[in-house]
Structures are given as C-alpha cells and as structure tokens.
Amino acid sequence: MCFSRADAADNYPFGTCQQRKLFPHFHPPNLIGNKFVPLRGSPHRGPGCYFSDGYGLAYDLSKIPTSIKGYTLGARTAVRFKPIQKEMTPHAGRYQKVSPQQEKHKQNFAPFNVLVPRFKNYPKDTYYPSPGAYNPEKKPPPKIAWPMKFGSPDWAQVPCLQKRTLKAELSTDKDFRKHRNRVAYLSLYYN
C-alpha cells in the first residue's frame, strides 16, 4: 500500500515546488538518457562482491536496453556500429627488461649530407686540357648586325621596298624580307 502511493506521487503537476526527478540521479527514457548515463549506485558493493568486469561503468554502458528498430515515440536507439573493444595494456608478466646495449639501430638517413664526398672527382682530360688543345682567343659566333645609327638600324643603307599607299602586306613583301635576311646572314661567312 505504501508503494502504490509513491508510484502515484511520481506525476507532479507543473509549477509545484515538489521534488522532481532531475538528471544526475534520474534519466529520461530516450536518446539523451542513452548518451549521458546518470549517476547510479552499485548494489553489489561489499567484501567479496566486487567484480570490475560485471558491475562497472563499462558493464553499465554495454547493458543499456536499446532498440535496433529505430527512434519512434521516445524509444532508445542502439548505436549502429558498436566500437571494437581492444585491450592494449599488457599484463604484468608481459613486460620485458630494456637493455640499451642490444638496441643498436642503423640510421636510415645521414644528417647534414655527411655521406656526400667532400671533393668531387672530375675526369682530368676535359677539365684540365693540355697546352695547344684549345685556342684562348676563340671568338664567339658572329651575329647579324645591321648598319646602326644612334642605336636603331639605318634603314637608308638596308635594302627596302618602296612605300605604298596601301598598308597591306603582300606575299612578295614577305619573300623579299626573307631573302634580305638570308643574304645578311650568309654575308657573315661568305664575303
């Protein structure tokens, strides 16, 4: 009879100052209650009753009642892809003694180009030619130089076509320019 009264007193009217179920101690039956698990006391605490794998935080998180059908009418939905639980910490017998004498690793790179030879080995024939094998007064190849007058070509001495009133270039003009440049180039070698 006493328990039925407590169940009926759970529905508090809005605006009253009575005690309500607040989050740290109670949780809503929806997705927020799944994600943020409230504080709960463990009833199995005492001598000989402590099993960390059965009554811990990880156990409570894995045993939340959820539904894989989807989120409808406040139902708690399960995680679609559960995280893989990995035990990365080795047990006490797996630890090994570190001995720095045995751990000598070969470097896979040389810092500051240490392995580069200090002096380059050049073949002596090409870099140090014998006397008489070259001409020190060798001239660079000749370039075409038009008759110049104050930094620009002197067109009075260069053969040109007569000026026309029509500015269009004919194919004969192009042939004449090609021939003039060819004659100037060949005159460097055949004078």
UniProtKB/Swiss-Prot annotation:
Keyword vocabulary terms for this entry: Cilium biogenesis/degradation, Cytoplasm, Cytoplasmic vesicle, Golgi apparatus
Keyword flag Cytoplasm: yes
InterPro entries named in the record: CIMAP3, SHIPPO-rpt
GO biological process entries: cilium organization; embryonic heart tube left/right pattern formation; positive regulation of kinase activity; regulation of cell projection organization
Paired cysteines (S-S): none
Compartments where located: Cytoplasmic vesicle; Golgi apparatus, trans-Golgi network; Cytoplasm
One Pfam entry name: SHIPPO-rpt
Keyword Cytoplasm: yes
GO CC term (a single one): nucleus
One MF annotation (Gene Ontology) recorded for this entry: protein kinase binding
Domain of life: Eukaryota
Principal localisation: cytoplasm
Function of the molecule: During primary cilia disassembly, involved in cilia disassembly. Required specifically to control cilia retraction as well as the liberation and duplication of the basal body/centrosome. May act by stimulating AURKA activity at the basal body in a cell cycle-dependent manner.
Oligomeric form and interacting partners: Interacts with proteins involved in ciliary transport, including ARL13B, CETN1, KIF3A, RAB6A, RAB8A, TUBB1 and TUBG1. Interacts with AURKA.
Protein name in the entry: Ciliary microtubule-associated protein 3
Gene name for this UniProt entry: CIMAP3
